Amino acid sequence: MNFETIIGLEVHVELKTDSKIFSSSPNHFGAEPNTNTSVIDLGYPGVLPVLNKRAVDFAMKAAMALNCQIATDTKFDRKNYFYPDNPKAYQISQFDKPIGEHGWIEIEVGGKKKRIGITRLHLEEDAGKLTHGTDGHSLVDYNRQGTPLVEIVSEPDIRTPEEAYAYLEKLKAIIQYTGVSDCKMEEGSLRCDANISLRPIGQEAFGTKTELKNLNSFNFVRKGLEYEEKRQEQVLLSGGVIEQETRRYDEAGNKTILMRVKEGSDDYRYFPEPDLVNLYIDDNWKERVRSEIPELPDARKDRYVSELGLPAYDAHVLTLTKEMSDFFEETIREGADAKLASNWLMGEVLAYLNAEQKELQESALTPAGLAGMIKLITSGTISSKIAKKVFKELIENGGDPEQIVKDKGLVQISDEGELRKIVAEVLDANAQSIEDYKNGKDRALGFLVGQMMKATKGKANPQLVNKLLLEEMDKR
Protein backbone atom coordinates (compact mmCIF):
# COMPACT_ATOMS: atom_id res chain seq x y z
CA MET A 1 0.00 0.00 0.00
CA ASN A 2 1.24 3.48 -0.87
CA PHE A 3 0.62 6.51 1.30
CA GLU A 4 0.33 10.25 0.81
CA THR A 5 2.00 12.50 3.38
CA ILE A 6 0.04 15.47 4.74
CA ILE A 7 2.00 18.21 6.52
CA GLY A 8 0.88 21.45 8.13
CA LEU A 9 3.16 23.95 9.87
CA GLU A 10 2.54 26.40 12.71
CA VAL A 11 5.13 29.15 12.81
CA HIS A 12 5.48 31.66 15.66
CA VAL A 13 7.26 34.90 14.82
CA GLU A 14 8.17 37.51 17.44
CA LEU A 15 7.69 41.09 16.28
CA LYS A 16 10.58 43.50 16.87
CA THR A 17 8.65 46.37 18.37
CA ASP A 18 10.43 48.53 20.95
CA SER A 19 7.95 47.61 23.67
CA LYS A 20 5.69 44.67 24.45
CA ILE A 21 2.22 44.11 23.10
CA PHE A 22 0.21 45.15 26.17
CA SER A 23 2.74 47.04 28.31
CA SER A 24 5.58 49.54 28.03
CA SER A 25 8.20 46.96 29.05
CA PRO A 26 11.23 46.87 26.72
CA ASN A 27 11.15 44.22 24.02
CA HIS A 28 14.84 43.40 23.61
CA PHE A 29 16.62 40.05 23.52
CA GLY A 30 19.52 39.23 25.82
CA ALA A 31 18.69 41.22 28.97
CA GLU A 32 19.30 39.80 32.43
CA PRO A 33 16.47 37.42 33.43
CA ASN A 34 13.30 39.07 34.72
CA THR A 35 14.46 42.64 34.09
CA ASN A 36 12.22 43.45 31.08
CA THR A 37 8.97 42.89 32.96
CA SER A 38 6.14 44.86 34.55
CA VAL A 39 3.07 44.31 36.68
CA ILE A 40 1.03 44.05 33.46
CA ASP A 41 3.25 41.31 32.02
CA LEU A 42 3.09 39.38 35.30
CA GLY A 43 -0.69 39.69 35.65
CA TYR A 44 -0.89 41.59 38.93
CA PRO A 45 -4.46 42.17 40.17
CA GLY A 46 -6.12 45.36 38.98
CA VAL A 47 -3.81 46.11 36.04
CA LEU A 48 -5.13 46.53 32.50
CA PRO A 49 -3.52 45.82 29.12
CA VAL A 50 -3.05 48.60 26.56
CA LEU A 51 -2.68 47.43 22.96
CA ASN A 52 0.55 48.41 21.17
CA LYS A 53 -0.58 49.89 17.83
CA ARG A 54 2.85 49.26 16.29
CA ALA A 55 2.38 45.54 16.93
CA VAL A 56 -0.91 45.67 15.03
CA ASP A 57 0.82 47.49 12.14
CA PHE A 58 3.52 44.83 12.04
CA ALA A 59 1.00 41.97 12.13
CA MET A 60 -0.97 43.57 9.30
CA LYS A 61 2.21 44.09 7.26
CA ALA A 62 3.20 40.44 7.68
CA ALA A 63 -0.32 39.27 6.78
CA MET A 64 -0.42 41.46 3.67
CA ALA A 65 3.00 40.22 2.53
CA LEU A 66 1.62 36.68 2.86
CA ASN A 67 -1.39 37.57 0.67
CA CYS A 68 -3.86 37.34 3.55
CA GLN A 69 -7.22 39.07 3.67
CA ILE A 70 -7.13 41.64 6.48
CA ALA A 71 -10.04 41.66 8.91
CA THR A 72 -12.08 44.81 9.37
CA ASP A 73 -13.47 43.66 12.73
CA THR A 74 -11.06 41.67 14.90
CA LYS A 75 -10.79 40.97 18.60
CA PHE A 76 -8.66 39.37 21.30
CA ASP A 77 -9.53 36.33 23.40
CA ARG A 78 -8.30 34.63 26.54
CA LYS A 79 -6.70 31.23 26.01
CA ASN A 80 -6.87 29.56 29.40
CA TYR A 81 -4.21 27.14 30.58
CA PHE A 82 -1.93 26.74 33.60
CA TYR A 83 1.82 26.50 33.18
CA PRO A 84 4.71 28.13 35.07
CA ASP A 85 5.74 30.30 32.10
CA ASN A 86 2.21 31.77 31.96
CA PRO A 87 1.82 33.97 35.07
CA LYS A 88 -1.78 35.05 34.38
CA ALA A 89 -2.97 31.44 33.79
CA TYR A 90 -4.29 32.70 30.45
CA GLN A 91 -2.74 34.02 27.27
CA ILE A 92 -4.21 36.92 25.32
CA SER A 93 -4.57 35.60 21.79
CA GLN A 94 -7.09 35.63 18.91
CA PHE A 95 -9.57 32.81 18.39
CA ASP A 96 -12.43 33.27 15.94
CA LYS A 97 -11.51 36.66 14.45
CA PRO A 98 -7.82 36.62 13.47
CA ILE A 99 -6.21 39.67 11.93
CA GLY A 100 -5.47 37.84 8.65
CA GLU A 101 -6.92 34.84 6.81
CA HIS A 102 -6.82 32.96 3.49
CA GLY A 103 -3.26 33.78 2.46
CA TRP A 104 -0.68 31.89 0.42
CA ILE A 105 2.95 31.79 -0.61
CA GLU A 106 4.57 30.17 -3.62
CA ILE A 107 7.46 27.74 -3.23
CA GLU A 108 9.66 25.98 -5.76
CA VAL A 109 10.99 22.44 -5.29
CA GLY A 110 12.75 20.47 -8.00
CA GLY A 111 12.00 23.16 -10.57
CA LYS A 112 8.24 22.95 -9.91
CA LYS A 113 6.29 25.82 -8.37
CA LYS A 114 3.53 25.20 -5.87
CA ARG A 115 1.21 27.44 -3.88
CA ILE A 116 0.88 26.69 -0.15
CA GLY A 117 -2.20 28.11 1.53
CA ILE A 118 -2.12 30.00 4.82
CA THR A 119 -5.18 29.41 6.98
CA ARG A 120 -4.69 32.35 9.32
CA LEU A 121 -2.30 34.78 10.92
CA HIS A 122 -3.23 35.94 14.39
CA LEU A 123 -1.66 38.25 16.95
CA GLU A 124 -0.94 37.19 20.53
CA GLU A 125 1.44 37.59 23.45
CA ASP A 126 4.40 35.27 23.96
CA ALA A 127 4.94 33.28 27.15
CA GLY A 128 7.96 33.28 29.44
CA LYS A 129 10.85 30.86 29.05
CA LEU A 130 11.59 27.88 31.29
CA THR A 131 15.14 26.65 31.89
CA HIS A 132 15.36 23.16 33.34
CA GLY A 133 18.31 22.48 35.64
CA THR A 134 20.09 19.19 36.22
CA ASP A 135 19.15 19.32 39.92
CA GLY A 136 15.46 18.81 39.19
CA HIS A 137 14.59 22.49 39.56
CA SER A 138 13.36 24.78 36.78
CA LEU A 139 13.83 28.53 36.49
CA VAL A 140 11.49 30.86 34.65
CA ASP A 141 12.48 34.08 32.86
CA TYR A 142 9.54 36.40 32.20
CA ASN A 143 11.44 38.77 29.90
CA ARG A 144 9.74 37.12 26.90
CA GLN A 145 6.30 37.23 28.53
CA GLY A 146 4.15 39.75 26.64
CA THR A 147 6.38 39.95 23.57
CA PRO A 148 4.17 40.55 20.51
CA LEU A 149 3.90 37.43 18.42
CA VAL A 150 2.16 36.35 15.24
CA GLU A 151 1.22 32.72 14.70
CA ILE A 152 1.08 31.71 11.03
CA VAL A 153 -0.84 28.50 10.36
CA SER A 154 -0.46 26.81 6.99
CA GLU A 155 -3.10 24.78 5.20
CA PRO A 156 -2.30 21.03 5.07
CA ASP A 157 -1.00 21.53 1.52
CA ILE A 158 2.58 20.39 2.12
CA ARG A 159 3.32 16.89 0.84
CA THR A 160 7.03 16.31 1.51
CA PRO A 161 9.65 17.33 4.09
CA GLU A 162 11.46 19.12 1.26
CA GLU A 163 8.37 21.24 0.57
CA ALA A 164 8.18 22.04 4.30
CA TYR A 165 11.80 23.23 4.21
CA ALA A 166 11.14 25.37 1.12
CA TYR A 167 8.00 26.84 2.74
CA LEU A 168 9.91 27.85 5.86
CA GLU A 169 12.75 29.39 3.86
CA LYS A 170 10.30 31.42 1.80
CA LEU A 171 8.21 32.45 4.81
CA LYS A 172 11.29 33.58 6.72
CA ALA A 173 12.55 35.60 3.75
CA ILE A 174 9.21 37.37 3.28
CA ILE A 175 8.93 38.26 6.98
CA GLN A 176 12.54 39.51 7.09
CA TYR A 177 12.00 41.68 4.01
CA THR A 178 8.99 43.37 5.64
CA GLY A 179 11.22 44.33 8.58
CA VAL A 180 8.76 43.21 11.25
CA SER A 181 11.05 40.49 12.67
CA ASP A 182 14.64 39.31 12.39
CA CYS A 183 13.43 35.65 12.46
CA LYS A 184 16.45 34.38 14.42
CA MET A 185 15.69 30.81 15.45
CA GLU A 186 18.71 30.76 17.76
CA GLU A 187 17.11 33.60 19.76
CA GLY A 188 13.61 32.16 19.61
CA SER A 189 12.17 34.91 17.42
CA LEU A 190 11.04 32.24 14.95
CA ARG A 191 9.75 28.89 16.18
CA CYS A 192 8.02 26.08 14.34
CA ASP A 193 5.80 23.12 15.18
CA ALA A 194 4.86 20.57 12.54
CA ASN A 195 1.83 18.33 12.13
CA ILE A 196 2.17 15.22 9.96
CA SER A 197 -0.15 12.38 9.01
CA LEU A 198 -0.34 9.71 6.32
CA ARG A 199 -3.33 8.47 4.33
CA PRO A 200 -3.68 5.83 1.62
CA ILE A 201 -3.37 7.37 -1.83
CA GLY A 202 -6.86 8.18 -3.09
CA GLN A 203 -8.42 8.53 0.36
CA GLU A 204 -9.98 11.92 1.09
CA ALA A 205 -10.10 11.76 4.88
CA PHE A 206 -6.95 12.76 6.72
CA GLY A 207 -5.11 10.24 8.85
CA THR A 208 -4.39 10.72 12.57
CA LYS A 209 -1.78 13.44 12.94
CA THR A 210 1.31 13.64 15.09
CA GLU A 211 2.65 16.98 16.33
CA LEU A 212 6.43 17.51 16.28
CA LYS A 213 8.20 19.91 18.65
CA ASN A 214 11.80 20.86 19.52
CA LEU A 215 12.50 21.76 15.91
CA ASN A 216 15.32 24.25 16.40
CA SER A 217 16.32 24.70 12.77
CA PHE A 218 14.77 24.29 9.34
CA ASN A 219 17.05 21.32 8.80
CA PHE A 220 15.71 19.70 11.98
CA VAL A 221 12.17 20.29 10.71
CA ARG A 222 13.05 18.43 7.53
CA LYS A 223 14.86 15.60 9.34
CA GLY A 224 12.12 15.23 11.95
CA LEU A 225 9.45 15.00 9.26
CA GLU A 226 11.50 12.49 7.25
CA TYR A 227 11.86 10.25 10.30
CA GLU A 228 8.22 10.58 11.30
CA GLU A 229 7.07 9.86 7.74
CA LYS A 230 8.99 6.56 7.76
CA ARG A 231 7.89 5.70 11.32
CA GLN A 232 4.20 6.17 10.55
CA GLU A 233 4.47 4.21 7.31
CA GLN A 234 6.06 1.27 9.15
CA VAL A 235 3.34 1.34 11.82
CA LEU A 236 0.54 1.36 9.23
CA LEU A 237 2.10 -1.34 7.04
CA SER A 238 2.47 -3.61 10.06
CA GLY A 239 -1.24 -3.24 10.86
CA GLY A 240 -0.79 -0.78 13.70
CA VAL A 241 -2.67 2.42 14.48
CA ILE A 242 -1.22 5.93 14.65
CA GLU A 243 -1.91 7.61 17.99
CA GLN A 244 -2.64 11.31 18.24
CA GLU A 245 0.44 12.38 20.14
CA THR A 246 3.10 15.01 20.56
CA ARG A 247 6.68 13.96 19.83
CA ARG A 248 9.95 15.83 20.05
CA TYR A 249 12.82 15.61 17.62
CA ASP A 250 16.04 14.22 19.10
CA GLU A 251 18.87 15.62 16.99
CA ALA A 252 21.51 13.34 18.55
CA GLY A 253 19.67 10.18 17.52
CA ASN A 254 17.96 11.74 14.47
CA LYS A 255 14.59 10.39 15.62
CA THR A 256 11.36 11.52 17.23
CA ILE A 257 10.55 10.63 20.84
CA LEU A 258 7.11 10.47 22.46
CA MET A 259 6.34 13.38 24.80
CA ARG A 260 2.64 12.83 25.49
CA VAL A 261 -0.45 11.19 24.03
CA LYS A 262 -3.41 13.43 23.21
CA GLU A 263 -6.76 11.79 23.93
CA GLY A 264 -8.66 14.69 22.41
CA SER A 265 -8.21 18.25 21.24
CA ASP A 266 -7.01 20.76 23.83
CA ASP A 267 -9.79 22.71 25.52
CA TYR A 268 -8.51 26.19 26.25
CA ARG A 269 -11.99 27.58 27.07
CA TYR A 270 -11.54 30.61 24.84
CA PHE A 271 -13.68 33.63 25.62
CA PRO A 272 -13.44 37.30 24.55
CA GLU A 273 -10.82 39.34 26.42
CA PRO A 274 -12.99 41.61 28.63
CA ASP A 275 -10.25 44.22 29.12
CA LEU A 276 -9.83 44.98 25.39
CA VAL A 277 -12.49 46.31 23.05
CA ASN A 278 -12.92 44.98 19.52
CA LEU A 279 -10.40 46.36 17.05
CA TYR A 280 -11.77 47.92 13.86
CA ILE A 281 -9.35 48.32 10.96
CA ASP A 282 -10.61 50.74 8.31
CA ASP A 283 -9.44 51.03 4.69
CA ASN A 284 -7.24 54.06 5.40
CA TRP A 285 -5.32 52.13 8.04
CA LYS A 286 -4.93 49.16 5.71
CA GLU A 287 -3.68 51.31 2.83
CA ARG A 288 -1.18 53.13 5.06
CA VAL A 289 0.34 49.84 6.17
CA ARG A 290 0.27 48.42 2.64
CA SER A 291 2.21 51.45 1.37
CA GLU A 292 4.99 50.66 3.87
CA ILE A 293 5.65 47.15 2.51
CA PRO A 294 9.03 47.15 0.72
CA GLU A 295 10.06 45.13 -2.33
CA LEU A 296 9.59 41.46 -1.44
CA PRO A 297 11.91 38.58 -2.44
CA ASP A 298 9.97 37.39 -5.51
CA ALA A 299 9.82 40.90 -6.97
CA ARG A 300 13.50 41.47 -6.24
CA LYS A 301 14.42 38.10 -7.77
CA ASP A 302 12.50 38.95 -10.97
CA ARG A 303 14.28 42.32 -11.15
CA TYR A 304 17.71 40.69 -10.82
CA VAL A 305 16.89 38.46 -13.79
CA SER A 306 15.24 41.07 -16.03
CA GLU A 307 17.37 44.14 -15.25
CA LEU A 308 20.73 42.73 -14.13
CA GLY A 309 20.77 39.67 -16.37
CA LEU A 310 21.45 37.21 -13.55
CA PRO A 311 20.51 33.54 -13.99
CA ALA A 312 17.32 32.58 -12.16
CA TYR A 313 19.25 30.32 -9.77
CA ASP A 314 21.67 33.10 -8.80
CA ALA A 315 18.77 35.50 -8.21
CA HIS A 316 17.04 32.89 -6.05
CA VAL A 317 20.09 32.30 -3.83
CA LEU A 318 20.82 36.02 -3.44
CA THR A 319 17.26 36.82 -2.35
CA LEU A 320 16.90 33.96 0.16
CA THR A 321 17.89 36.36 2.94
CA LYS A 322 17.40 40.10 3.08
CA GLU A 323 20.87 40.50 4.55
CA MET A 324 22.57 38.92 1.53
CA SER A 325 20.32 40.68 -0.97
CA ASP A 326 20.87 44.10 0.62
CA PHE A 327 24.63 43.47 0.65
CA PHE A 328 24.52 42.60 -3.06
CA GLU A 329 22.49 45.73 -3.85
CA GLU A 330 24.95 47.96 -2.02
CA THR A 331 27.93 46.24 -3.70
CA ILE A 332 26.65 47.02 -7.19
CA ARG A 333 25.75 50.56 -6.09
CA GLU A 334 29.45 50.89 -5.23
CA GLY A 335 30.24 50.20 -8.89
CA ALA A 336 30.87 46.44 -8.98
CA ASP A 337 29.85 44.31 -11.95
CA ALA A 338 26.59 42.57 -10.98
CA LYS A 339 27.55 39.11 -12.24
CA LEU A 340 30.98 39.20 -10.59
CA ALA A 341 29.43 40.43 -7.34
CA SER A 342 26.91 37.59 -7.51
CA ASN A 343 29.64 35.02 -8.18
CA TRP A 344 31.75 36.18 -5.23
CA LEU A 345 28.82 36.28 -2.82
CA MET A 346 27.52 32.86 -3.85
CA GLY A 347 30.99 31.35 -3.98
CA GLU A 348 33.77 32.59 -1.72
CA VAL A 349 31.57 34.57 0.69
CA LEU A 350 29.05 31.80 1.40
CA ALA A 351 31.82 29.20 1.59
CA TYR A 352 33.66 31.27 4.21
CA LEU A 353 30.51 31.97 6.25
CA ASN A 354 29.48 28.30 6.23
CA ALA A 355 32.97 27.14 7.22
CA GLU A 356 33.18 29.68 10.06
CA GLN A 357 29.49 29.32 10.99
CA LYS A 358 29.06 33.08 10.88
CA GLU A 359 26.46 35.51 9.63
CA LEU A 360 27.47 38.04 7.00
CA GLN A 361 27.22 40.97 9.42
CA GLU A 362 29.60 39.17 11.79
CA SER A 363 32.40 39.31 9.21
CA ALA A 364 34.57 42.34 8.44
CA LEU A 365 33.55 42.40 4.77
CA THR A 366 31.73 45.51 3.54
CA PRO A 367 29.97 46.18 0.22
CA ALA A 368 32.52 48.92 -0.50
CA GLY A 369 35.39 46.51 0.16
CA LEU A 370 33.98 43.77 -2.06
CA ALA A 371 33.15 46.27 -4.82
CA GLY A 372 36.65 47.75 -4.63
CA MET A 373 38.22 44.32 -5.00
CA ILE A 374 35.98 43.44 -7.96
CA LYS A 375 36.93 46.70 -9.68
CA LEU A 376 40.61 45.78 -9.26
CA ILE A 377 39.87 42.50 -11.04
CA THR A 378 37.97 44.10 -13.94
CA SER A 379 40.67 46.76 -14.39
CA GLY A 380 43.35 44.06 -14.61
CA THR A 381 45.18 45.29 -11.51
CA ILE A 382 44.89 41.87 -9.87
CA SER A 383 44.02 38.41 -11.14
CA SER A 384 41.14 36.30 -9.84
CA LYS A 385 43.69 34.09 -8.10
CA ILE A 386 45.32 37.03 -6.32
CA ALA A 387 41.84 38.36 -5.51
CA LYS A 388 41.30 35.35 -3.23
CA LYS A 389 44.20 36.53 -1.06
CA VAL A 390 42.74 40.04 -0.96
CA PHE A 391 39.30 38.64 -0.17
CA LYS A 392 40.62 36.64 2.79
CA GLU A 393 42.10 39.80 4.27
CA LEU A 394 38.90 41.78 3.62
CA ILE A 395 36.50 39.29 5.18
CA GLU A 396 38.70 38.65 8.23
CA ASN A 397 40.10 42.11 8.93
CA GLY A 398 38.43 44.59 6.58
CA GLY A 399 40.38 47.45 5.05
CA ASP A 400 40.83 49.10 1.67
CA PRO A 401 41.47 46.57 -1.15
CA GLU A 402 43.81 48.92 -3.03
CA GLN A 403 45.93 49.42 0.08
CA ILE A 404 45.99 45.67 0.76
CA VAL A 405 47.23 45.02 -2.79
CA LYS A 406 49.87 47.71 -2.42
CA ASP A 407 51.07 46.64 1.04
CA LYS A 408 51.31 42.96 0.08
CA GLY A 409 52.81 43.58 -3.36
CA LEU A 410 49.98 41.80 -5.14
CA VAL A 411 49.66 43.98 -8.24
CA GLN A 412 49.19 41.81 -11.32
CA ILE A 413 52.12 41.74 -13.73
CA SER A 414 50.79 42.86 -17.10
CA ASP A 415 54.00 44.27 -18.55
CA GLU A 416 54.53 42.28 -21.75
CA GLY A 417 58.28 42.78 -21.81
CA GLU A 418 58.72 41.58 -18.24
CA LEU A 419 56.49 38.56 -18.77
CA ARG A 420 58.17 37.63 -22.07
CA LYS A 421 61.50 37.28 -20.25
CA ILE A 422 59.93 34.94 -17.67
CA VAL A 423 58.20 32.97 -20.45
CA ALA A 424 61.58 32.40 -22.10
CA GLU A 425 63.05 31.13 -18.82
CA VAL A 426 60.12 28.77 -18.22
CA LEU A 427 60.28 27.38 -21.76
CA ASP A 428 64.05 26.91 -21.57
CA ALA A 429 63.55 24.82 -18.43
CA ASN A 430 60.69 22.74 -19.87
CA ALA A 431 61.64 21.65 -23.39
CA GLN A 432 59.69 18.39 -23.02
CA SER A 433 56.46 20.30 -22.36
CA ILE A 434 56.95 22.26 -25.59
CA GLU A 435 57.33 19.03 -27.51
CA ASP A 436 54.29 17.49 -25.77
CA TYR A 437 52.14 20.49 -26.66
CA LYS A 438 53.21 20.39 -30.29
CA ASN A 439 52.31 16.70 -30.33
CA GLY A 440 48.72 17.52 -29.34
CA LYS A 441 48.89 17.20 -25.57
CA ASP A 442 46.91 20.29 -24.52
CA ARG A 443 47.56 19.63 -20.83
CA ALA A 444 51.16 20.65 -21.42
CA LEU A 445 50.00 24.25 -21.89
CA GLY A 446 48.26 24.14 -18.52
CA PHE A 447 51.46 22.88 -16.94
CA LEU A 448 53.44 25.76 -18.45
CA VAL A 449 50.87 28.29 -17.27
CA GLY A 450 51.25 26.81 -13.79
CA GLN A 451 55.02 27.22 -13.98
CA MET A 452 54.55 30.86 -14.96
CA MET A 453 52.25 31.43 -11.99
CA LYS A 454 54.77 29.73 -9.73
CA ALA A 455 57.58 31.92 -11.06
CA THR A 456 55.54 35.10 -10.57
CA LYS A 457 53.93 34.01 -7.27
CA GLY A 458 50.54 34.06 -8.96
CA LYS A 459 50.81 37.68 -10.05
CA ALA A 460 51.09 37.18 -13.82
CA ASN A 461 48.15 38.24 -15.99
CA PRO A 462 46.76 34.81 -17.01
CA GLN A 463 45.35 35.95 -20.37
CA LEU A 464 48.65 37.55 -21.33
CA VAL A 465 50.58 34.50 -20.11
CA ASN A 466 48.59 32.21 -22.43
CA LYS A 467 49.13 34.55 -25.37
CA LEU A 468 52.89 34.87 -24.83
CA LEU A 469 53.42 31.15 -24.22
CA LEU A 470 51.74 30.28 -27.52
CA GLU A 471 53.69 32.95 -29.38
CA GLU A 472 57.05 31.88 -27.99
CA MET A 473 56.38 28.16 -28.55
CA ASP A 474 55.53 28.86 -32.20
CA LYS A 475 59.03 30.31 -32.60
CA ARG A 476 60.72 27.17 -31.29
UniProtKB/Swiss-Prot annotation:
Tagged with keyword Nucleotide-binding: yes
Family in the record: Belongs to the GatB/GatE family. GatB subfamily.
Subunit structure as annotated in this protein's UniProt entry: Heterotrimer of A, B and C subunits.
Keywords on record: ATP-binding, Ligase, Nucleotide-binding, Protein biosynthesis
Enzyme Commission (EC) number: 6.3.5.-
Protein role: Allows the formation of correctly charged Asn-tRNA(Asn) or Gln-tRNA(Gln) through the transamidation of misacylated Asp-tRNA(Asn) or Glu-tRNA(Gln) in organisms which lack either or both of asparaginyl-tRNA or glutaminyl-tRNA synthetases. The reaction takes place in the presence of glutamine and ATP through an activated phospho-Asp-tRNA(Asn) or phospho-Glu-tRNA(Gln).
Species for this entry: Shouchella clausii (strain KSM-K16) (Alkalihalobacillus clausii)
Gene3D superfamilies with a match to the protein in the record: 1.10.10.410, GatB domain, N-terminal subdomain
Pfam family, one: GatB_N
Top-level EC class: ligase
Record carries keyword Ligase: yes
Matching HAMAP family: GatB
Protein name per its UniProtKB record: Aspartyl/glutamyl-tRNA(Asn/Gln) amidotransferase subunit B
Any one of the GO BP annotations: translation
Top-level taxon of the source organism: Bacteria
Organism phylogeny: Bacteria, Bacillati, Bacillota, Bacilli, Bacillales
Protein's gene: gatB
Catalytic activity: L-glutamyl-tRNA(Gln) + L-glutamine + ATP + H2O = L-glutaminyl-tRNA(Gln) + L-glutamate + ADP + phosphate + H(+); L-aspartyl-tRNA(Asn) + L-glutamine + ATP + H2O = L-asparaginyl-tRNA(Asn) + L-glutamate + ADP + phosphate + 2 H(+)
Gene Ontology MF term list: asparaginyl-tRNA synthase (glutamine-hydrolyzing) activity; ATP binding; glutaminyl-tRNA synthase (glutamine-hydrolyzing) activity
